[in-house]
Amino acid sequence: LEIYPDAEIIPCKTFDECFSKANENDKIRIIIPESNRITGNIGVEYLIFKYRLNIYAEHFHSVQHHLLGLPGTKIKDIKNVYSHGQALSQSSKFIKKSNLIENVRADTAGSAKYISENKNKSEAAIASKLSAKIYNLDILASNIEDEKENATRFLIMGKPVLQPVLGKDKYITSFLFKLKSKPAALYQSLGGFAINGVNLTKLQSYPEKNSFTSYFFLCDLDGHIDEPKIQKSLEELGLHCEDFHVLGVFPADKFREK
């Protein structure tokens, strides 16, 4: 809603379903959590490799987690807590202090819905204030996340390839690549970035399907693909690659400056 306030919202049960819908319909945009400041990568890399959708933008969203329960419930009554694995990990100190049993579910909002429908006062969910309002739940404890500066990076993605014209803004270029199988391939492939003074903000490996000897790499760099130094660096990288694919060029979110 922050990004597309007038858009029709289509809920999906899984990340794979989100990617699949966008892959089948050019008019659909998906907003996918990619990484978290506390717990790191969310785990959608394999879907980025699988579908190769275009990235249009990034959005950083501050995260606050709340313990939600049925109206009239007290924290001392709670034995089981339900939420997405990331929310549970990000609230681990509170969970441990309260001696709660963790139960992993597909998402935070779905966990709140489960609590609302199951009508068991020994159960609670970790979710947002909006979920509490939607499902008529009490907020038993507010801001239970381990770190108060918690934030999640989201990617806005879709099927059509769209790229901003190079201007004065700060940009991120995102791409994936697979190296040729030879000694020191990764070391040699990254030399062009060092020589041309290009900063890599992310470099992550992921095993190719059914293999632990062949890897794809997911990379973000500071800059626009049309900048000469970026082009030279990527040309150098290409000499060492079996596969190379640009995922997107987009303005760097101002949150990065904080």
Regions found by a protein language model. Give the residues of each.
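Domain-level signature for soluble enzymes in the chorismate/prephenate branch of the shikimate pathway
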Residues: 1-258
